[in-house]
A protein has these predicted regions:
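Beta-strand-rich modules
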Residues: 448-468
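Catalytic domains of carbohydrate-active enzymes, especially glycoside hydrolases
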Residues: 54-80, 182-185
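Active-site-adjacent "subsite" loops/lids of carbohydrate-active enzymes
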Residues: 34-54, 123, 128-181, 274
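Active-site neighborhood of glycoside hydrolase catalytic domains
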Residues: 170-176, 180-290, 294-309, 316-320
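Conserved aromatic anchor
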Residues: 411-422
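Aromatic- and acidic-residue-enriched segments that line the glycan-binding/catalytic groove
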Residues: 81-96, 129-155, 191-216, 261-270
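Substrate-binding cleft of secreted/luminal carbohydrate-active enzymes
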Residues: 276-302, 313-314, 319-394
Length: 475
């Protein structure tokens, strides 16, 4: 009899319990938005501010509809700025003329529109590229003109000398300025540290930094160059930790650390010896929050095996940082079917030892559904929404469950949320006859309309990715 009473009480409790929302996946799903050469956005220089904003909003809307949750936006292509800067001139990729005010702040606009849609916005900087071509017309306040002693001509490039401590410090200060003034979610750098080798007969053209080596160097030249980049990466990471510890630092190096590593790997470029990028060291030391090796090869590539390279990077991670490879969605075509990208993402999920993630190179191929790749990903890979993962190595407390009030408003409900510090997004889950649906919105929003539902659950997603317990309303 006592057992029957316990069973009855348990069933009654279940009947009275509020519907609990399903746990959401945690996965970084991003796309690079390149502004250099107008690759992704704006589609050409000189568009009106209205046209530029319209293009970016469409790109963000399509990204959300696809299932992405982050954008990596290039804001400093070549010592220029896609934001209001006291250090560097306006980028010519906006107006066609370096230094000309575009009439709005593209980065501020991008942050607002991304967060409004539940997208993280990572600001992507090229730390040392000063000009893509030495013949380009530059403004009088460009670093090439204001500090020519920091600049080296290398082939067609103009380059900030990584061997000059003042030049390194300048690039760090440019990035810290953005961290301090803008509500970005991450600072991102790609594979350009020392420049890619410029051909010179049968040998690469030497980088012209012997004067810097004589002033600042010690030991062997190649080791000194690597130490310059190591010091830059470590200093930047530590400075951002002190300034805004919740802002991620991510780097997307060349996908092969060294030729022959792992065994059997072939590479036409030695990033360790020619770009002086010891990306394995940065990962091992924990000087990044995520590493995004550019694994642009196919799964069945013999000399550059995608799963073999991914497994190697995952295994070089004693600090348990995020390993989120970049994938070459732009190569979908006759030789690479769209299914390759879905299969690569599946491999990333299976081989990851932490939270999985990836970024598409580049946004244009996804947004414009190159050879049907977007439709395929929506149908097979991104059926369920995902939140960006937390950084488990950062000390942060779980946000409090949100406080909200629901009131009728015509055919919808008005949901009012109480402000919370240290929260990036509200995660709203609604249960209807069709199941649970999810939307993610900016935590600055304190009033939103929702459709009537059997249950509504709201959680707070903290700045470091920690999710609160949900506050639940049920009919």
């Amino acid at each position: 009899m006592a057992r029957l009473l316990l069973v009855y009480l348990a069933i009654s409790a279940l009947a009275l319990a509020k519907p609990y929302p399903p746990e959401l996946s945690r996965e970084f799903r991003a796309a690079w938005v390149a502004t250099v050469y107008n690759i992704d956005w704006p589609t050409k220089a000189g568009l009106t501010p209205e046209a530029q904003r319209e293009e970016l909003v469409k790109l963000f809307d399509t990204s959300v509809q696809t299932g992405l949750n982050a954008i990596i936006l290039q804001v400093r292509p070549a010592a220029d700025a896609l934001y209001q800067s006291a250090y560097e001139p306006w980028s010519p990729y906006l107006t066609g003329e370096m230094g000309r005010d575009p009439g709005y702040d593209p980065l501020e606009f991008a942050i607002q529109e991304a967060h409004r849609r539940g997208l993280e916005l990572h600001a992507w900087f090229n730390p040392f590229r000063a000009q893509t071509n030495h013949k380009n017309k530059v403004s009088s306040n460009h670093i090439v003109n204001t500090r020519p002693d920091w600049i080296k001509r290398y082939g067609n490039y103009l380059w900030l000398d990584p061997g000059n401590p003042e030049a390194r410090r300048y690039s760090i200060q440019v990035m810290l300025d953005v961290v301090e003034r803008y509500d970005i979610d991450g600072v991102h750098m790609d594979d350009y540290f020392y420049p890619y080798p410029f051909p010179n007969n049968d040998k690469p053209l030497p980088f012209p930094d012997m004067d810097s080596f004589e002033r600042f160097g010690r030991g062997k030249l190649n080791n000194w160059r690597r130490s310059n980049i190591d010091n830059f990466v470590e200093d930047l990471y530590q400075e951002i930790r002190k300034t805004k510890p919740w802002v991620d630092v991510g780097i997307s190096p060349f996908g092969i650390w060294k030729p022959g590593v792992p065994k059997g790997t072939e590479a036409s470029l030695d990033a360790y010896s020619l770009l002086y990028a010891d990306a394995r060291k940065w990962l091992r030391k924990g000087w990044v929050d995520y590493i995004m090796p550019q694994l642009y090869w196919s799964i069945d590539s013999k000399g550059q095996s995608f799963p073999k390279l991914l497994n190697w990077w995952v295994g070089e991670n004693p600090k348990n940082r995020h390993v989120w490879p970049g994938i070459a969605t732009d190569r979908v075509g006759d030789q690479r079917h769209a299914a390759e990208m879905a299969n690569q993402i599946s491999l990333i999920r299976n081989l990851s030892r932490g939270y999985p993630g990836h970024s598409h190179w580049s946004a244009d191929s996804v947004v414009n559904d190159q050879r049907g790749v977007r439709k395929l990903l929506v149908r097979t890979t991104y059926q369920s929404p995902a939140l960006t993962p937390p950084n488990r190595w950062q000390k942060a407390k779980k946000p409090e469950a949100p406080t909200f009030v629901l009131t009728p408003s015509g055919e919808t409900l008005s949901l009012r949320l109480a402000h919370q510090d240290d929260v990036r997004f509200w995660v709203i889950q609604s249960k209807t006859d069709e199941g649970w649906s999810t939307s993610v919105i900016d935590s600055k929003v304190q009033k939103v309309s929702v459709k009537p539902a059997e249950a509504i659950a709201v959680s707070a997603l903290g700045l470091t990715g920690i999710l609160s317990k949900p506050a639940i309303y049920s009919e």
